[in-house]
C-alpha cells in the first residue's frame, strides 16, 4: 500500500515554495467548530458517570478526556476506514525507517485479535494502525487499556466506558497530575 507510506512521510517544503502548514488560527476552526463542540457536550452528558469515575480513580479532569476523544475521532464519527491488519503489515515490511516499531505493533494487534476472537480484516482504524475512539496503537491498548464497564474485555471501539477509563489510565501512567 504505497499510499500508506506517503501518508507516513512528512512533507518537506521545497526552497522557493510556500509552506502550506496551517497556523493555529486556521487549524482552530477544525477542532472548535459548532458541530464538534455540540458532539462533545452530548458525549459528556451521555457518559457523565464514567467520566466522574475516571476522575475519582485516575485524577484526570473529564474535559481533558472529552478533548482527546474530540480531536482523535470527533466522538467516534471518524475512527478510520483502513484495515488495521493491512496497514500494520505494510508498515512493518515496506516502511523501512520504522519497520521495527510497526512489527511490534503488528504482533500486539495479532494477540488482541486472538484474545478477543476478532476477525482480522474487520478491524478498521487509521492508516498507521491506531484504533478505537482514542486512536490507541495496539501496544497502548495492551499497556493502558482498561475494562471500565466490567464486561470482562477491553473494547475501545464500541465501549465509551472502556475508552474513558483507558485514556485516563494512559494519562495517569504517563504522570498526569490533576490541577
Protein language model features and the residues they cover:
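Cell-wall glycan-active module
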Residues: 1-124, 129, 139-179
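Functionally critical loop-and-helix segments that line ligand-binding/catalytic clefts
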Residues: 135
Amino acid at each position: 500500500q504505497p499510499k500508506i507510506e506517503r501518508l507516513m512521510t512528512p512533507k518537506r517544503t521545497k526552497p522557493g515554495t510556500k509552506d502550506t502548514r496551517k497556523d493555529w488560527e486556521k487549524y482552530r476552526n477544525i477542532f472548535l467548530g459548532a458541530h464538534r463542540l455540540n458532539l462533545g457536550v452530548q458525549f459528556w452528558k451521555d457518559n457523565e458517570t464514567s467520566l466522574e469515575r475516571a476522575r475519582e480513580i485516575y485524577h484526570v479532569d473529564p474535559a481533558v478526556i472529552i478533548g482527546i476523544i474530540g480531536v482523535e475521532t470527533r466522538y467516534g464519527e471518524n475512527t478510520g476506514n483502513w484495515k488495521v491488519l493491512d496497514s500494520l503489515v505494510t508498515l512493518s515490511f515496506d516502511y523501512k525507517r520504522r519497520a521495527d516499531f510497526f512489527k511490534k505493533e503488528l504482533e500486539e494487534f495479532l494477540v488482541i485479535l486472538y484474545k478477543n476472537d476478532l476477525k482480522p480484516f474487520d478491524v478498521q482504524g487509521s492508516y498507521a494502525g491506531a484504533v478505537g475512539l482514542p486512536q490507541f496503537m495496539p501496544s497502548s491498548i495492551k499497556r493502558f487499556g482498561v475494562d471500565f464497564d466490567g464486561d470482562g474485555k477491553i473494547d475501545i471501539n464500541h465501549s465509551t466506558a472502556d475508552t474513558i477509563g483507558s485514556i485516563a489510565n494512559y494519562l495517569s501512567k504517563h504522570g498526569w497530575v490533576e490541577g
